[in-house]
Amino acid sequence: MIASKESNSAATPATSAPTLRTTAEIAATAAMGHAPHETFTINLGPQHPAAHGVLRVLMRMDGEWVENAEPVIGYIHRMHEKMGENRTWAKFLPNTSRIDYLSAMHYTHAWVGVVERGLKIEVPERAEYIRVITSELNRIASHQVWWGALLLDLGGFTPILYAFDDREKILDLLEGLCGARLTYCYYRFGGLYNDADDDFLKGTREFVKYMRPRLKMYRDLVTDNVILRQRLTGIGPISADTCRKYGATGPVIRGSGVAYDVRRAEPYSVYPKLQFKIPTYPECDSMARYLVRMDEMEESLNIIEQCLDLIQPGPFMAPKVPRVIRLPAGDYTYAVEAARGRFMVRVVSDGKENPYRARLRTPSFGNLSLFEETSRGMLLPDALAMMGSLDLVIPDIDR
């Protein structure tokens, strides 16, 4: 049974609902007074701090009110899918760490997972536990970047210093494990590049103990701050139907009350053996999406701790993995729950050394797609706060 965390309405200060202008209200305003009604267009990006990357949003404004906001993408399109079709299965592995560079472990997991499914490779249990540990560490590190950047958008500078300081501890752990701090490429078909030593496992356990009181401090100093709640509560409402309409997943749809998580809906690795909750909030606003991610960091710590207790000595690679990968002709899919939502790999194989077709379904594209509809009638600062709550990574959109 899927568990969910109910929102604590008593802890939320009473705030007045934000004013959203409908098309009719905008037209009525235009008819008032003697001056002719004029709108103007501004470009948010493609180089703007609030865009968090090379994203351009063409915004038609009526004063401070957003009449329409059209995302313009493609500035860093790198043809990952086409490269996947022109490279061997193994040579495409480094690409997976560079699609969503903040969630690299999850993306590599999906690529090796689809190959292992096609070749019916049984991954050793120890390798699966290490994959889950590193994936959840990567999820926390990604949420740290989102948390600090969102508060920076809202005018708070200090929290991002705390976030990056704590994230640095995760990067140090992963660097000691695989030698990289961002684009890891640590997983291999059938297992891992190398085994996790005792120093990594001990350091990870110490990090879990360190991070729990830090998250409580985040909640006391930031989450319960009345200014933050006034900036996010009631801002950017996104209904569950709108999420489904545009294919939004991850914390965005869970912030709209839908307890959809790939780790439960499409179980993979050793997640079925682990106990964890799926945080959901029914309010559908930016504050709900904020709370989902804060709760997810706590759940990731619980998952990591369970894996550390359950992991046993053993091999970290499957004994028989073909040196030359050739998937049997067919259509294969594999999905994971990345930091921003559902990432799915779909490949069509014709039995050769490279895929006939490679399809990468990334979460950020669906999460951005709903911005144009949901931002209409909002004040510009509120629209930027809502965009920050979507946690966009631009290379994940353009691919």
UniProtKB/Swiss-Prot annotation:
Membrane topology note: Peripheral membrane protein
Reactions the enzyme catalyzes: a quinone + NADH + 5 H(+)(in) = a quinol + NAD(+) + 4 H(+)(out)
Cellular localisation: Cell inner membrane
The entry's keywords: Cell inner membrane, Cell membrane, Membrane, NAD, Quinone, Translocase, Transport, Ubiquinone
Region span, Disordered: 1-20
Low complexity biased stretches: 9-20
Keyword Transmembrane part of the UniProt annotation: no
Broad class of enzyme this protein falls into: translocase
Pfam families listed in its UniProt record: Complex1_49kDa (PF00346)
GO molecular function: NAD binding; NADH:ubiquinone reductase (non-electrogenic) activity; quinone binding
GO cellular component: plasma membrane
Domain of life the protein comes from: Bacteria
EC number: 7.1.1.-
Main location as per UniProt: membrane
Family annotation (InterPro entries): NADH_Q_OxRdtase_suD (IPR001135), NDH1_su_D/H (IPR022885), NiFe-Hase_large (IPR029014)
Similarity comment: Belongs to the complex I 49 kDa subunit family.
Binding partners and assembly: NDH-1 is composed of 14 different subunits. Subunits NuoB, C, D, E, F, and G constitute the peripheral sector of the complex.
Functional summary from the UniProt entry: NDH-1 shuttles electrons from NADH, via FMN and iron-sulfur (Fe-S) centers, to quinones in the respiratory chain. The immediate electron acceptor for the enzyme in this species is believed to be ubiquinone. Couples the redox reaction to proton translocation (for every two electrons transferred, four hydrogen ions are translocated across the cytoplasmic membrane), and thus conserves the redox energy in a proton gradient.
The name this protein goes by in its record: NADH-quinone oxidoreductase subunit D 2
Species assigned in the record: Opitutus terrae (strain DSM 11246 / JCM 15787 / PB90-1)
Top-level taxonomy: Bacteria, Pseudomonadati, Verrucomicrobiota, Opitutia, Opitutales
Gene: nuoD2
